[in-house]
């Protein structure tokens, strides 16, 4: 198999680094790096839910995605300055939220909210997939925080791990984890969100330069799922380390009647 411009095989991910405890204030805080793409993912816990959710006994998970002005070579204005959130930002924010809600039992949260924020510090392709992969680790830490505080009705509300990766057809070849140089000229561009149980959460695919046959779709999915297995292993290794902050003390155990 011939090498790509950065020396990788077609089925090889860029170097993946997951750093927990990147900042101190949120319950979960992660810096994830896919090569030169760097995304800070935080998961903050707040008591209560939105008005439409009150009285349901269910929690909620929401997500926001944004890029810092200097994340790309050319500085872009903050969307808050423009006075509106762009369509791409809204789309990716919703994608991150949908992806993470696929793995958590919201009933176990009670009426509490987990707010996930993904901020792209440096972009070189694959920012949304890096955001989802890192956000899962931040979410897992937030769940540990809630469990320590005695806020969960189920101590293990996460049913699976979530990871995401980009795949595409570049120069007629199926490739995984596209940097900007490849993504900008891909004939087919696809993002795949998957669980560690082998199921799919979301598939976003477009024939940018040409149509493509079903056989190519199968190759893209096979390569994406293989890459996600590598990402799941990286998440597992990161989460095997102790919680990087200070966990709250839970409520004291209730006394048995007559004690």
From Swiss-Prot:
Query: Would I find Phosphoprotein among this entry's keywords?
Result: no
On assembly, the entry states: Homohexameric ring arranged as a trimer of dimers.
Q: Name one GO molecular function term.
A: tRNA nucleotidyltransferase activity
- Which SUPFAM superfamilies has this protein been placed in? Ribonuclease PH domain 2-like, Ribosomal protein S5 domain 2-like
Give the species this sequence originates from: Mycobacterium ulcerans (strain Agy99)
* UniProt name for this protein: Ribonuclease PH
Q: What is its EC number?
A: 2.7.7.56
The organism's superkingdom is given as Bacteria
